[in-house]
Amino acid sequence: MQFKVYTYKRESRYRLFVDVQSDIIDTPGRRMVIPLASARLLSDKVSRELYPVVHIGDESWRMMTTDMASVPVSVIGEEVADLSHRENDIKNAINLMFWGI
């Protein structure tokens, strides 16, 4: 579901990702996601517009917008958070990456 954060079932450098695909678009067996990385891994100088900071529990994460990818639904694990309240920030990061706006 769009803007939900899920665990990643497979071995990966990323443990979490946010589903950014519209729920009205059906791509059988796949979803568009943006992985999350610990905020500690990125300098504060890195753009917060392109790589928004999100908080899940007591941890800070950065959305790795430039690593957005289509993944099989079979790798989508447990839902751990809902980022619907950050919808505008997420959309703005995607717009910035693709259209520079």
UniProtKB/Swiss-Prot annotation:
It comes from the Bacteria. Changing W99 to L/Q/S/Y: Loss of toxicity. Disruption phenotype: Disruption of both ccdA and ccdB has no phenotype, except for increased plasmid loss. One of its GO terms (molecular function) is DNA topoisomerase type II (double strand cut, ATP-hydrolyzing) inhibitor activity. One of its GO terms (biological process) is negative regulation of DNA-templated transcription. One of its GO terms (cellular component) is toxin-antitoxin complex. Changing G100 to E/R: Loss of toxicity, no decrease in protein stability. Still represses ccdAB operon, still forms complex with CcdA. Keywords: Plasmid, Repressor, Toxin-antitoxin system, Transcription, Transcription regulation. It holds the Pfam family CcdB. InterPro entries: CcdB (IPR002712), Plasmid_toxin/cell-grow_inhib (IPR011067). Homodimer. Forms a complex with GyrA, probably a tetramer GyrA(2)CcdB(2), in which GyrA is inactive. Forms a complex with antitoxin CcdA; there are both high- and low-affinity binding sites for CcdA such that both CcdA-CcdB(2) and CcdA(2)CcdB(2) complexes can form. The CcdA-CcdB(2) trimer is sufficient for rejuvenation, whereas maximal operon repression occurs with CcdA(2)CcdB(2). When the CcdA:CcdB ratio is lower than 1, a CcdA(2)-CcdB(4) complex is formed which is devoid of repression activity. In this case repression is alleviated and both proteins are produced. Toxic component of a type II toxin-antitoxin (TA) system, functioning in plasmid maintainence. Responsible for the post-segregational killing (PSK) of plasmid-free cells, also referred to as a plasmid addiction system. Half-life of over 2 hours. Cell killing by CcdB is accompanied by filamentation, defects in chromosome and plasmid segregation, defects in cell division, formation of anucleate cells, decreased DNA synthesis and plasmid loss. Belongs to the CcdB toxin family. This is Toxin CcdB. It comes from Escherichia coli (strain K12). The gene is ccdB.
